[in-house]
Amino acid sequence: MVKRVQLVLTKDVSKLGRSGDLVDVAPGYARNYLIPQSLATHATPGILKQVERRREQERQRQLELRQQALEQKEALEKVGSLKIAKQVGENEAIFGTVTSQDVADAIQAATSQEVDRRGITIPDIGKLGTYKAEIKLFSDVTAQIDIEVVAS
């Protein structure tokens, strides 16, 4: 029978777990690598209580962030449509493209809320018209918004 040691990870370890996870590993792996590298500590009752307290705080923080994302989604959907002005050439083709940064700036101007540009998904916009953008506000909260590209 193989003996295992219970440890609490203090840092993220690839293929093993994240910081705060309780893991069972071989004694040699714990003694020779994880503990000397300060990647883990022995799982004592006091440390387990600390880990559980940290997990609960993180859970509460995630719930608050999700609630803020839902409120932000409602505010974005109330706006309806955003207008972005671009210079136009022949055949209603715009110079350059509309980027996620342009959309983020338009959102901030319309709602005074900051949105991370990396969470904005837009189609390739090369002409005037109305397009749909998807904004990821949280892992499971996304908002749809219309973008109207007009000539400046």
Curated annotation (Swiss-Prot):
Keywords: Ribonucleoprotein, Ribosomal protein, RNA-binding, rRNA-binding. GO terms for biological process: translation. GO terms for cellular component: ribonucleoprotein complex; ribosome. Coiled coil: none annotated. InterPro entries: Ribosomal_bL9 (IPR000244), Ribosomal_bL9/RNase_H1_N (IPR009027), Ribosomal_bL9_bac/chp (IPR020594), Ribosomal_bL9_C (IPR020069), Ribosomal_bL9_C_sf (IPR036791), Ribosomal_bL9_N (IPR020070), Ribosomal_bL9_N_sf (IPR036935). GO terms for molecular function: rRNA binding; structural constituent of ribosome. The keyword Transmembrane does not apply. Belongs to the bacterial ribosomal protein bL9 family. HAMAP family: Ribosomal_bL9. Binds to the 23S rRNA. This is Large ribosomal subunit protein bL9. It comes from Trichormus variabilis (strain ATCC 29413 / PCC 7937). The lineage of its organism: Bacteria, Bacillati, Cyanobacteriota, Cyanophyceae, Nostocales.
